[in-house]
């Protein structure tokens, strides 16, 4: 790696100017030179840059672990006229973890660096025929963390339907399409305070719902309450100075994903800001829904039938299912190694109906369509765009379908990019490739001390020098480590202004620490 000297004076920078397009400029990069960190348990509360420690439960496939430090958030941004290309390791700069199970034990699945190189279209368009989300990644947060669908790949597998429905949930079971599980109903206990987790087979840290810690980092109407005993934050809504949510991520159809707050009137930026109300409600007998608590899971809502290809020749709502597709009653229970499971209302996607199919009007009784978005103006798109919004209820809790519905609004046109076009324009290259800059000096007029500060990369080594004439340089410190968990490093030269009528400083990166590329 070529190391560059940083001069406090005569520093002429000619940065590339990114095209004024939110899909290019909205990515979170200011902490790209910081290592990702994990808190491992309620007993091991010091954030670690490698994990898990020896002796800590590791249920990852093959015992896979993060054995080298890895840089957080988005690392590189490039674009062409048609696409944007994002490089990231898939790990956040806020402290991740810990993750627990229902019983309070360690989850045992650990996040791993993913080395993403993702392409997302810059020219999204509504799809005439909507596409159901696949398993795995369906978008990317602006910090480079994966977005998953609201489901968890499990559904109900019926073993009998007479005299009563019996069975259990399983991955890829035959209930897909009518009784597929809502991940939040089952997995939320395994989320960290940032509201994400990862599977053990690949360590892909991801979100199914609102990214609480990222929202806090971006200033999206959130506050953090620190718990000293666990060294973690609890994130809650803060509407004291309510403002329009920022872009939190991008779906793989190229449309933005905002936080939960938008303009009250979709096309009027002067209409005030409100929480965007989900269009989905539980099928509990209210709002014109069927009451599954009394009827059992013998019908499927119209939206789900259309989404999963279930025949509905009469275009009715709800759709009556054959007995072989009945789901469990809301009081049904099974007992297994993890204890007793109750199949309560809200466990499955089919437990929710869409208000638009119940005679209500979008923009009046609810704000978001069945894809969990709307066409609207936003601060980033003053002329209008289609946009998704994360959904929360009036108490600040996540609300179905949480982030995106079960289908893309637009045509999916994104994914892993094996190559980058040679004409792609680079607007950011951070992490270990950061081009450091000197920051203004801070002097103490009484002591003559000078604080020398520069932007730095965590783990790297710098030599700091001083000169009175820009020709002869004196080494002040030959080995300064880039400060931990921050993007700036400082040292002080004592009495500098008293001993020297004028003084110049420079810092040179002399070594890069070993890291996970």
Segments from the language model and where they lie:
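A short, polar beta-strand/turn micro-motif
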Residues: 85-135, 139, 209-264, 401-403, ...
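Short linear interaction motifs
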Residues: 97-103, 180-194, 238-241, 361-375
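Short, composition-biased motifs enriched in small/polar/acidic residues
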Residues: 435-517
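Extended, compositionally biased non-globular segments
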Residues: 253-255, 260, 269-435
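Sec-dependent signal peptide recognition
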Residues: 2-9
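Histidine-centered catalytic micro-motifs
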Residues: 202-212, 386-392
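Hydrophobic h-region of N-terminal signal peptides that target proteins for export
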Residues: 10-19
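Solvent-exposed N-terminal domain segments of exported/luminal and surface proteins
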Residues: 21-192
């Amino acid at each position: 790696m070529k190391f560059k000297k940083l001069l406090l004076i005569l520093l002429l920078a000619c940065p590339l100017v990114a095209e004024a397009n939110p899909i290019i400029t909205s990515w979170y990069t200011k902490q790209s030179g910081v290592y990702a960190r994990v808190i491992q348990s309620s007993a091991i509360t010091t954030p670690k840059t490698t994990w898990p420690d020896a002796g800590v439960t590791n249920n990852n496939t093959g015992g896979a672990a993060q054995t080298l430090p890895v840089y957080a958030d988005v690392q590189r941004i490039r674009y062409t006229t048609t696409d944007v290309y994002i490089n990231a390791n898939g790990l956040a700069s806020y402290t991740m973890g810990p993750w627990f199970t229902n019983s309070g034990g360690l989850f045992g699945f650990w996040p791993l660096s993913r080395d993403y190189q993702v392409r997302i279209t810059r020219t999204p368009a509504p799809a005439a025929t909507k596409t159901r989300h696949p398993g795995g990644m369906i978008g990317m947060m602006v910090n480079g963390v994966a977005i998953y669908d609201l489901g968890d790949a499990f559904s109900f597998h019926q073993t009998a339907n007479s005299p009563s429905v019996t069975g259990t949930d399983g991955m890829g079971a035959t209930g897909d399409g009518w009784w597929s599980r809502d991940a939040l109903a089952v997995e939320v206990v395994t989320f960290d305070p940032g509201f994400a987790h990862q599977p053990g087979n690949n360590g892909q840290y991801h979100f199914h719902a609102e990214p609480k810690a990222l929202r806090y980092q971006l200033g999206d109407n959130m506050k953090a309450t620190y718990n000293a005993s666990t060294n973690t934050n609890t994130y809650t809504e803060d509407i004291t100075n309510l403002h329009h949510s920022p872009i939190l991520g991008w779906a793989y159809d190229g449309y933005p994903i905002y936080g939960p707050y938008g303009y009250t009137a979709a096309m009027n930026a002067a209409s005030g800001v409100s929480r965007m109300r989900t269009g989905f409600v539980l099928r509990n007998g209210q709002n014109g829904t069927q009451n599954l608590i009394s009827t059992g899971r013998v019908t499927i809502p119209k939206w789900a039938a259309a989404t999963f290809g279930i025949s509905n020749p009469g275009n009715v709502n709800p759709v009556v299912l054959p007995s072989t597709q009945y789901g469990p009653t809301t009081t049904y229970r099974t007992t297994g190694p993890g204890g007793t499971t109750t199949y309560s209302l809200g466990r499955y996607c089919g437990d929710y109906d869409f208000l638009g199919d119940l005679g209500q009007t979008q923009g009046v009784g609810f704000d978001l369509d069945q894809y969990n978005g709307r066409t609207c103006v936003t601060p980033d798109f003053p002329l209008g765009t289609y946009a998704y919004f994360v959904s929360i209820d009036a108490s600040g809790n996540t609300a179905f379908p949480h982030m995106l519905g079960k289908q893309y609004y637009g045509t999916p046109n994104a994914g892993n990019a094996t190559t980058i076009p040679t004409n792609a324009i680079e607007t950011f290259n951070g992490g270990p490739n950061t081009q450091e800059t000197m920051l203004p000096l801070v002097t103490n007029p009484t002591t003559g001390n000078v604080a020398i500060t520069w932007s730095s990369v965590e783990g790297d080594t710098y030599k700091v020098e001083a000169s009175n004439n820009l020709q002869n340089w004196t080494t002040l410190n030959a080995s300064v480590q880039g400060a931990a968990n921050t993007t700036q490093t400082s040292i002080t030269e004592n009495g500098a202004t008293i001993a020297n009528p004028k003084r110049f400083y420079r810092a040179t990166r002399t070594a890069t620490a070993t890291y996970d590329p």
